Amino acid sequence: MSTVKDAAGPVFAGIDIGGTSIKWMIVDEVGAILTQGSEPTRCEAVAEQVGGIGSRLAHAHPGLVGVGLICPGLVDEEKGTVVYAANLELRGVQLARAVEEATGVPAALMHDGRAAGLAEGLLGAGRGASSFLMMPIGTGISVALMLGNQLWSGATCSAGEVGHAPIFPGGEPCRCGSRGCLEVYASAKGIARRYAQATGENIGTKAIEKAIGTDPVATEVWETAVRALALSLTHMTLTVDVERIIIGGGLSHAGENLLAPLREELASMLTFRDAPTIVRASLGGSGGRWGAAILAARVGGSTCYERWQP
């Protein structure tokens, strides 16, 4: 944990629960980050781990008035419940209530993809667009849909769970029980796994990206990921017709090595119309945490986030 400074007024905690790590930050009313940190996710005891983090943050910051929680999977935001999150081994967990009990302050839960979209819409690359699609690509893949300036969660709170949509039917198995899912081929975890499976070397996505063009396996794995993403984005573009596509999450750090071939592939698939603009998320890998902090401010009764400038 790193501490920048203390605060005298109200503060808000944003906690981003991922399949690999849990990241958090404390933000004050003007949007200054006071404290931030991370620790590896203990998938066998996520609820207890998050409650412990919240308790420590509340103890260290008496001005804490709200906690925003975000995680992947099927999330009932109204009830603050993780209905099902395959990568976290959670099913039917009332996470917001657990954190409220641990901290003594209001807590709210949101899907991590929608939280990143919320942050990009208010503070980042989505500003000025009434409709956009935000796709964070990390351990998993999801999308946030901003339609008519409103985030769309769907009839069963599962809008945007594209990571578990079969993109290559009958393909490689996914942890969700299906086969050929987008996450299997195009998530950061999936890219690293497929390379390791083919070569016996676990080198990670950054090394795979650097090896494009010189390592035939890295090139094939990367090109397959780009094609899978383009197929998914083609389906979504033709369904909801957004004006902008924002790529975020850890894989977005690849920059034009990812975005340039993705633009080209998407344009080749949309044969009868122009493709939407594809841009990199301006908040980078911290977009989810900023969304969680906005959620914390809202549950704490504040609209101060409207003035934040990350």
List the predicted regions and their residue ranges.
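A charged helix-plus-loop insertion that forms the helical arch/lid used to bind
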Residues: 80-91
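ATP-binding/phosphotransfer module of carbohydrate and carboxylate kinases, centering on a glycine-rich
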Residues: 1-66, 76-79, 97-107, 119-129, ...
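Short hydrophobic alpha-helix segments
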Residues: 37-39, 86, 155
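A short acidic Gly-Thr/Ser loop motif
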Residues: 16-20, 136-140, 158
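Short beta-strand scaffold segments in enzyme catalytic cores
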Residues: 22-26, 141-146
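A short acidic/small-residue loop/turn micro-motif
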Residues: 40-43, 90, 158-161
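Short loop/edge segments at beta-strand edges and connector loops
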Residues: 109-113
